[in-house]
Amino acid sequence: MFNKVEADIDGKLISIETGKLAKQASGSIVISCGGTVVLVTVVGAKTSNPNVDFLPLTIEYQEKFSAVGRVPGNYFRREIGRPSDQEVLTCRIIDRPLRPLFPEGYRSETQVIATVLSADQVNSPDVLALTGASAALSISHIPFAGPVAGGRIAYIDGKYVLNPTFAELESSSMDLMVACTRNAIVMVEGKADELSEDEILGAIFFAFENLQPLINLQDELQRANGLEKIVVESPVIDAELKAKVVEIAAAGMQKVYTTVDKLERGKVYDDLKKEVVAQLDTEEGLRASEISSLLSDFKKTYLREKTVNTGVRIGGRAWDEIRDISSETEYLPKTHGSALFTRGETQALVTATLGSERDKQRVETLNGETSRRFMLHYNFPPYCVGEARFLRGPSRRDIGHGTLATRGLEAVLPSEEDFPYAIRVVSEILESNGSSSMASVCGGSMAMMDAGVPLKRPVSGIAMGLIKEGEGVAILSDILGDEDHLGDMDFKVVGTCDGITALQMDIKIDGVSRDIMSNALDQAKRGRMHILEEMSKGIAEARAEVVEHAPKYFIHKISQDKIRDIIGPGGKIIKELSAQYDAKIEVDDSGLVKMFVANGALAEALVERVKSITAEVEVGAVYTGKVKTIKDFGAFVEILPGTDGLVHISELALERVKDVTDVVNEGDTIEVKVLDVDNRGRIRLSRKALLG
């Protein structure tokens, strides 16, 4: 049955309809705002998959170029291959708030596909896709504890703006994505221009209050068009077996809790599991998996309660204690900049490389082709967690972590006018036990300063966690991998001494109040300040100049009518200069010549050569030139690179000359004076004028 519901959200009409498109899907909706239209479908298998012990949920997001009336620019002229980074990031934005809302034990294959059908290049489709995914799940048979509403928050002239246009975002000091249910914030992600904790917190709860109409809209649609939800039976727990597991494992779990080293802690737990299974597995392996599951549940409960009740975390740290930090720069001799950053058992080796305008990343989006001057690539090889597996391309997680670090560092980059290099930062995670993306931020900041990038201020990042047991709340700084897995919140904050530049928050439970979030932000700030202080021991400020083996940058302004001289016919001159001086040379339409020279020793020579090629010929000036061509009526002399003038036979000598070659020959170097430049640019020279 076709149905359409609408709501005015902060002055913008958002509509959700169902019953017209993709009716064979388990749930299908079309959500629109202005001229932006997104189709979201969800399909869930009717039966559970017995071969998996996790939620088999897949999220896909597709941007069709037909949505903006364009043909893809690739050879095949169609959308092919892997999704773009933007599509991957939107998949993650949709996935993270939805995944915790499926019931435990739901094991049916489920796929959500969001397709951008029309884009007006004013209203962003990603926020619509998030809300649309929730709406499609809500009307399907799939069990889902939603609905969820998503929105983007801007901060313009001291005011929060919900779902700003692309033009409004250009003048905003914040770009924050927020997702919420009726009762709680469930996801936050975005960047800011060094804003305060209070300004960030205000944005989050501004979104929560103003997104409630979208929750109501989905409830209305679900009441009218929703299918009956399937019931997921909760697994029956053998209370007697559970009690035995707890009794046998209690003493050993304390050893797990107090073991500091990650690998050793894992070994202690594995030994404990073998012991418990050996004592209780009396049915030839039939109950081993059940015993392991009960032991895992006990571990989670034990570690959570121990942390909240004792004020001491896994490994013995206090709630706000940061692991030991060490850092150094200039670790790699031939990179432009490098830093080794280690925090506990998390280690990142980060490099910074400087490039020219041509090294910018070209990106084709629905809003047109753009270029990225700053790139940060995050790599997470299997050995960093002691595993062996095939090396693939970057995963969705890699892209997401790299983007978070990118956002955190972008706010402190110098302007392109002050520092015209393209910058590529690569973070290789060598060890991982929590917050490797934040190690990438710290290492990236240090590597760029080591390369001579004049950052406005150093940047650090910290991963926070939360454990809420009854009335007890533990806010944890610099969380471990185990604390991330067992906790109720993963909250990453990036910033400088002046404010927050990026953050990412995933909350798994209801009931995280504004006070708890405020306390978490304040505790994160104290942690960031401590980390910045530790980083300053490795490098406190950027080098005064880029390193010797980095490309050197020079600019020279020429008149627009000289652009053709520096380029030459078919690009001949500029190609010759690039090859001779090992340089990248770019000339824009205004006459600005940008030169990136790989060998600093050749830089000044290139600049002088460019100046000579584009110099204006002055009447009355004397030049030393080379005879290029001999004619019966005189000799053509090159007085500037690519600029020839004629010495008429009558201007070669004081006496009468019968044959030009009696005075000069091709290849001779002579001094000449400029007599005249006519309106066609022809230059008249004289040798005779210098002989009297």
Curated annotation (Swiss-Prot):
Protein residues bound to Mg(2+): 484, 490
Catalytic activity as recorded in UniProt: RNA(n+1) + phosphate = RNA(n) + a ribonucleoside 5'-diphosphate
GO cellular component: cytosol
Keyword Methyltransferase tagged: no
UniProt domain KH: residue ranges: 551-614
Keyword annotations of the record: Cytoplasm, Magnesium, Metal-binding, Nucleotidyltransferase, RNA-binding, Transferase
Similarity comment: Belongs to the polyribonucleotide nucleotidyltransferase family.
Function: Involved in mRNA degradation. Catalyzes the phosphorolysis of single-stranded polyribonucleotides processively in the 3'- to 5'-direction.
Name this protein carries in UniProt: Polyribonucleotide nucleotidyltransferase
Source species of the chain: Desulfotalea psychrophila (strain LSv54 / DSM 12343)
Lineage start: Bacteria, Pseudomonadati, Thermodesulfobacteriota, Desulfobulbia, Desulfobulbales
Encoding gene (name): pnp
